[in-house]
């Protein structure tokens, strides 16, 4: 029996279809990449775990519960790969939970979240622009990130800048819960002559934020706000976990995991 384990940690989603297309998709790819490690997974969102348990009778462990199982089964070599987008609050809390079990492992390594250094920005830009529609001068593509009060939130502005630096002037990045917000994006787009806007989530899953805050029919959704300003709006409800090239970056981070 191997003494090696792989723990894949996600924020989670209560949407079955997008869970299968994104989180479980990445989990399967990572599990296949590390056949010498027993696979474990965990979600960090207590609200989502509670909803899955009570509504769907699906039991997924949180990080501490998964770690207890890993220790109980006697594994001493652990690789942890998060599917988080950035090194934000969720990733910090996840690492703290894992490290509280450090004494049980002879080897413990963490892979990086999706966007960790500058090379990740350019990799993701290349991956997404190959997958998404080519834009005319009258078309724009707007990504909705989650956003955070954590200092790592600055990566969204860096990503927007990097899109433009790499020859994609009609691509914009905003967030639903922080800065740059939709108002900031709209101000940058003003006077550019755009008629048609593509809207896409910059999130692992196309879940609640994508379905409601981005593409919902309420007047305060991004789609509705763009339409109210005279733009034609098309929503691309596809989580990042559906893109094979994005999954490959998570694999790369896992292969380059840093020991602690």
Task: For the regions a language model picked out, list residue spans one by one.
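Active-site-proximal alpha-helix that buttresses catalytic centers in soluble enzyme cores
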Residues: 1-260
């Amino acid at each position: 029996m191997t003494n090696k384990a792989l723990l894949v940690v996600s924020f989670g989603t209560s949407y079955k279809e997008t869970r299968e297309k994104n989180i479980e998709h990445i989990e399967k790819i990572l599990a296949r990449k590390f056949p010498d490690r027993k696979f474990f997974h965990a979600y960090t969102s207590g609200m989502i775990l509670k909803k899955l348990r009570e509504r769907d009778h699906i039991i997924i462990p949180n990080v501490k519960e998964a770690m207890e199982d890993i220790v109980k089964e006697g594994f001493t070599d652990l690789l942890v790969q998060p599917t988080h987008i950035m090194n934000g609050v969720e990733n910090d809390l996840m690492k703290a939970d894992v490290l509280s079990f450090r004494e049980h492992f002879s080897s413990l390594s963490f892979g990086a979240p999706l966007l960790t250094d500058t090379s990740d920005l350019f990799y993701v830009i290349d991956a997404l622009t190959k997958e998404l529609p080519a834009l005319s001068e009258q078309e724009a593509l707007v990504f909705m990130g989650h956003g955070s009060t954590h200092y790592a939130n600055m990566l969204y502005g860096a990503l927007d800048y990097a899109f433009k630096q790499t020859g994609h002037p009609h691509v914009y990045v905003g967030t639903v819960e922080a800065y740059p917000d939709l108002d900031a994006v709209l101000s940058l787009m003003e006077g550019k002559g755009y008629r048609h806007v593509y809207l896409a989530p910059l999130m692992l899953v196309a879940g609640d934020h994508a379905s409601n805050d981005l593409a919902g029919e309420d007047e305060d959704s991004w789609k509705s706000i763009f339409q109210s300003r005279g733009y034609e709006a098309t929503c691309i409800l596809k989580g990042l976990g559906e893109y094979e090239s994005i999954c490959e970056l998570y694999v790369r981070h896992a292969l380059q995991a840093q020991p602690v």
